[in-house]
Amino acid sequence: MLHLGTLVAVFVVLWKDIWALLRRPFQRLTALLIAATVPTVIIALAFKDLIEEAFHSGSTLGWEFLATAVVLVGAEKLAARAAAARRTELDMTFPDALIVGTLQGVAIMPAVSRSGLTIAGSLARNLDRSFAARFSFLLSIPAILGAVVFQAKDLAEGAAAGGGFTLPILVGTLTAMAVGVFAVKFTMRIIREGSMMGFAAYVGVLGVLVLLDQHLFRFFF
């Protein structure tokens, strides 16, 4: 149910873009979003067992945080080199979409930032920063819907065992929606006006701390 709260948050922030897609569904942006979704679905289905094991064990969390940091730094470096020749939405190609969608598939792993990797992919392809953020969050819609469908059976079984959808679930969903609205707006502003270097440093330090705890201190892992 938390996924639904996040989905509503995306709709709240990007309602103009979503309405434009609904009014004119057979436009190029729709085709790009579909193309980007294909590799995500393929990766999710092909590595389903591996992904579930990663979620349950948590053994790869530290490396995933570090990998996210490296990708973000690399994307910002590439984007800075080509800042004078930024490509717009009209310039995005289907290979661009496939690359971004593949990164979204990789980001199914628990400690990999979906928005971070997809935005980084767009920046690495020299796409406009504002469009990179918009495309990333629009692309999250089919991904979130897929996750909801994928977990529908577990949700139904949990609801039946617990006597229905309880107050904590409702509160969690509403909280996810409120936090999601703030997170989407904040991320889009950072991407448009700033840099992902701060977030890269954060996840990099977090990755080091997690690895130290997993292999030395064992306070949490």
Predicted stretch roles:
Residues 1-221:
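Multi-pass membrane proteins that catalyze or facilitate reactions on polyprenyl-/lipid-phosphate substrates
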